[in-house]
Amino acid sequence: MTPVVFTPSDEPYLGRELLCAFDNLICSCLELNAKCAPLSHGDELTDLQRAACILVPQTITLALSIRELIRQGYLFGAKVLMRPFVERAVTLMYVFHNSEGLELWNQGWDYRKRPTLQKMADYLNEKLLHGQSPMKGFSQAFNSATHGDPFSAQWNVVFHEGVPVFPVSKNLCSPGLADEICAEAIPWLASAMGMMSAAFNQREVGPGSKTN
């Protein structure tokens, strides 16, 4: 009988390599956050630190939410959360590298003035990679899953006796999709860790590293 609620010892995608990597990164992220959080309690924070105080916890919370949805087999829900998760990580990197972006953030990040996720990705690609990484259509899949266009069906379909069906509950038979979600989440959580570390001048914590 399939458990109603899975635990870390019996979850459906337990043992997947990318899931293990995601778990390890989450542990490192929480350890780094434990070092940085006390530094955010001061009165004299920089504009970047104040932005990080909002964006970093939200990014981590969404990463944990995605992880729990994978554990419970709700892969489509995890996929839908990827856009808000990625957007926060990208926004944090954008305001770190763009003083005008940071000023927009300080002014309330007005929807009519702030750059789209795609435009932020394009800017960072030019700024950091000199345009070497093709970013065209970067936000398309995220938008598709979020807004529910026909293309989004690919993340909520399984084959039962050779026939495609669209599940309404747990998806326990799509390890490839679980891997895809983890592969998307890992670099952006790592990016948020880098920005957190830079904002509060802390060395990043990785598996096997020593802390004081």
Regions found by a protein language model. Give the residues of each.
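Short, contiguous, well-structured surface segments enriched in hydrophobic/aromatic residues
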Residues: 30-69, 110
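Short, charged N-terminal helix-start/capping segments
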Residues: 1-17, 51-73
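Residue-level recognition of alpha-helical structural elements
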Residues: 48, 71-78, 131, 178
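Short, hydrophobic, well-ordered secondary-structure elements
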Residues: 56-97
